[in-house]
Swiss-Prot record:
Residues 50-82 are annotated as: Disordered. Phosphorylated by host PRKCA. Residues 55-64 have a biased composition (Polar residues). It comes from the Viruses. Influenza RNA polymerase is composed of three subunits: PB1, PB2 and PA. Interacts (via N-terminus) with PA (via C-terminus). Interacts (via C-terminus) with PB2 (via N-terminus); this interaction is essential for transcription initiation. Interacts (via C-terminus) with human PKP2 (via N-terminus); the interaction competitively inhibits the interaction between the RNA polymerase subunits PB1 and PB2. A motif (Nuclear localization signal) lies at residues 187-195, 203-216. It is found in: Host nucleus; Host cytoplasm. It is an enzyme of class 2 (transferase). Its main location: host cell. One of its GO terms (molecular function) is RNA-directed RNA polymerase activity. Its EC number is 2.7.7.48. Belongs to the influenza viruses polymerase PB1 family. This is RNA-directed RNA polymerase catalytic subunit.
């Protein structure tokens, strides 16, 4: 039957229909090919916004650098990065005046964090630029490689395990005349296969030592690798994002810790909180502005958009902010926090893989690596690419582009929020000294501005003043993309406010459905998503019930586990029917074994195994929860696991779900094809790393695991732990004397081997 879509909306208030206009159903667009073009765009744009600055040359690397700070004030509405140092410092001073002690207290909190943070903090995060191999790696591997290189070059402060000591090594590494690194390479050779007598290519992986001089090392240490941001909805063009190397990460972490601590104390900051807490915080600011404007004043809200926030921010400005925020603090603390912005004002952007050329006529493909862009003849490129390359050439060194102004995406979200809030703070009447005043919300580059004034002229004047004040610190409010409404209706970080926040349910759509981890986890995640949306996103009972039925249907099609009494034929139906017929209590079968669905919206919080346990046949229970089942490679499963769910915007977020280990919680094996590539050496390192960590966790179950104090290696810690445990077990009679002495002998042997090594 045909449904007239307008009928659906007759009874729906307009604000609730907003979510139907969002581009959030279907697959998001992904990028293919290299990100080189996007990165060049970023570099060229950033320099264009700051073009009236001063050019200098970095004495260590020879990179040309553009410094727009205190540059000419803009005379038009074009975006520009000419922040004025004195204005930024004054904004900081007023922020401190309105929040007495805020900087002081945040510094004290951060100092404590700095002294306690361990190096393993840097293993969090996904892809990281690994400077030793000059490409991206998982964070843990990149860190291990960096530490390995540091130690072989006589930098050993990191052995204490404290992040601050690792950073001391980073500083020292920059003073060394040369550094020796280990790189992976592969040899190919043609050999005859004995079985088939055909020629085959054999690949062997080697590691070779390589010396890097000071200049090359500095370039690598200051390099941000770039990639294309994937899965961005609602955009025609892709854009580049950056991933910094291990030298920069630790310093950034401490700066962001300080800025986070400040943001927590600022009522206008949308970071670092999220979800319902964020909504409550925002609602407070709106309430304040509306209460004060009841009778005499008008109140308007701008749903704000800034032009190219990152590309107009400047690390030198952040340095000025940090210098001000940490005044009166100990010298070591000020130094460690000022390194991140200094490194960023000397940063290099790696241009990625380069360009792919193909000749349709000759069926040839060839890749032009980024390193060649400086010297290659431009006649091969089309016009737009040619322009890009010409523009970027003066900035190129070894396939990286010098990029002093601008901040790459997502590096200093917290600190840039502090800057934004400091301008919102200037809207108080005591600072505007006139009839209009403003307040608002800031979350990284997103803002909402609420202006109150006795009449429309006052509102206009207030907005103009805000706009011009922002220009002074390198923030460019976009007049084209911002819009103004009577206070009570606005959008901020994809929250829609209409006399209270409206649930924007469409944003959660991508996280509904079957995740594809395994049968056990998928069932659990699916129902948890529905439960969470009932709690947080106005998912009503009828819709939730429907979502649940759709989910079960989707799940059965994904795993081909239709009910045992169904007519649908799949390649699993023979086995499932047999199981169905043998089972006395059919209600006890899991959905993934062809059982019925017992979920409804009242019991979504109960894992399926627990829900059906009492209904199961005894032998089915035994098979389902059997740790000795040879077909299952079991993880030791905590009671709560984390799944990564994809909301429609923002990063993938982690969601907890209950995990019950059954024969359905399998872990798929690693793809074999990686074993024949140059990644193989890295994979072996990674597996060794994994094995060590797993072993360590066996000795220190999480309940008894405290942060190690003092310097002891993992091996020493495990040996001493083994001795203590063995003694306790022996004295309580859990192990025999022979076993006890054998354990002690093994411990001594390990220590002996360590001494010989």
């Amino acid at each position: 039957m045909d449904v007239n879509p307008t009928l659906l909306f007759l009874k729906v208030p307009a604000q609730n229909a907003i979510s139907t206009t969002f581009p959030y159903t279907g697959d998001p667009p992904y990028s293919h090919g290299t990100g080189t073009g996007y990165t060049m765009d970023t570099v060229n744009r950033t320099h264009q916004y700051s073009e009236k600055g001063k050019w200098t040359t970095n004495t260590e690397t020879g990179a040309p650098q553009l410094n727009p700070i205190d540059g000419p004030l803009p005379e038009d509405n074009e975006p520009s990065g000419y922040a004025q140092t004195d204005c930024v410092l004054e904004a900081m001073a007023f922020l401190e005046e309105s929040h007495p002690g805020i900087f002081e207290n945040s510094c004290l909190e951060t100092m404590e964090v700095v002294q306690q943070t361990r190096v393993d903090r840097l293993t969090q995060g996904r892809q990281t630029y690994d400077w030793t191999l000059n490409r991206n790696q998982p964070a843990a591997t990149a860190l291990a490689n960096t530490i390995e290189v540091f130690r072989s070059n006589g930098l050993t402060a990191n052995e204490s395990g404290r992040l601050i000591d690792f950073l001391k090594d980073v500083m020292e590494s920059m003073d060394k005349e040369e550094i020796e690194i280990t790189t992976h390479f592969q040899r190919k050779r043609r050999v005859r296969d004995n079985m088939t007598k055909k020629m085959v290519t054999q690949r062997t992986i080697g590691k070779k030592k390589q010396r890097v001089n000071k200049r090359s090392y500095l370039i690598r240490a200051l390099t941000l690798n770039t990639m294309t941001k994937d899965a961005e909805r609602g955009k025609l063009k892709r854009r580049a994002i950056a991933t910094p190397g291990m030298q920069i990460r630790g310093f950034v972490y401490f700066v962001e810790t300080l800025a986070r601590s400040i943001c927590e104390k600022l009522e206008q900051s949308g970071l670092p909180v999220g979800g319902n807490e964020k909504k409550a915080k925002l609602a407070n600011v709106v309430r304040k502005m509306m209460t004060n404007s009841q009778d005499t004043e008008l109140s308007f809200t701008i749903t704000g958009d800034n032009t190219k926030w990152n590309e107009n921010q400047n690390p030198r400005m952040f340095l000025a902010m940090i210098t001000y925020i940490t005044k009166n603090q100990p010298e070591w603390f000020r130094n460690i926090l000022s390194i991140a912005p200094i490194m960023f004002s000397n940063k290099m952007a790696r241009l990625g893989k380069g360009y792919m050329f193909e000749s349709k006529r000759m069926k040839l493909r060839t890749q032009i690596p980024a390193e060649m862009l400086a010297s290659i003849d431009l006649k091969y490129f089309n016009e737009s690419t040619r322009k890009k390359i010409e523009k970027i050439r003066p900035l190129l060194i070894d396939g990286t582009a010098s990029l002093s102004p601008g901040m790459m995406m997502g590096m200093f979200n917290m600190l840039s929020t502090v800057l934004g809030v400091s301008i919102l703070n200037l809207g108080q009447k005591k600072y505007t000294k006139t009839t209009y005043w403003w307040d608002g919300l800031q979350s990284s580059d997103d803002f909402a501005l609420i202006v109150n004034a006795p009449n429309h002229e006052g509102i206009q004047a207030g907005v103009d003043r805000f706009y011009r004040t922002c220009k002074l610190v390198g923030i460019n409010m976009s007049k084209k993309k911002s819009y103004i409404n009577r206070t009570g209706t606005f959008e901020f970080t994809s929250f829609f406010y209409r006399y209270g926040f409206v649930a924007n349910f469409s944003m959660e759509l991508p996280s509904f459905g079957v995740s594809g981890i395994n049968e056990s986890a998928d069932m659990s995640i699916g129902v948890t998503v529905i439960k969470n949306n009932m709690i947080n996103n106005d998912l009503g009972p009828a819709t939730a019930q429907m979502a649940l039925q759709l989910f079960i249907k989707d799940y059965r099609y994904t795993y081909r586990c239709h009910r045992g009494d169904t007519q649908i034929q799949t390649r699993r139906s023979f086995e499932l029917k047999k199981l169905w017929e043998q089972t006395r209590s059919k209600a006890g079968l899991l959905v993934s074994d062809g059982g019925p669905n017992l979920y409804n919206i009242r019991n979504l919080h109960i894992p399926e195994v627990c829900l059906k346990w009492e209904l199961m046949d005894e032998d089915y229970q035994g098979r389902l929860c059997n740790p000795l089942n040879p077909f299952v490679s079991h993880k030791e499963i905590e009671s709560v696991n984390n799944a990564v769910v994809m909301p429609a915007h923002g990063p993938a977020k982690s969601m907890e779900y209950d995990a019950v280990a059954t024969t359905h919680s399998w872990i798929p094996k690693r793809n074999r094809s990686i074993l024949n590539t140059s990644q193989r050496g890295i994979l072996e390192d990674e597996q060794m790393y994994q094995k060590c960590c797993n072993l360590f966790e066996k000795f220190f179950p999480s309940s008894s695991y405290r942060r190690p104090v003092g310097i002891s290696s993992m091996v020493e810690a495990m040996v001493s732990r083994a001795r203590i445990d063995a003694r306790i077990d022996f004295e309580s009679g859990r192990i025999k004397k022979e076993e006890f002495s054998e354990i002690m002998k093994i411990c001594s042997t390990i220590e002996e081997l360590r001494r010989q090594k």
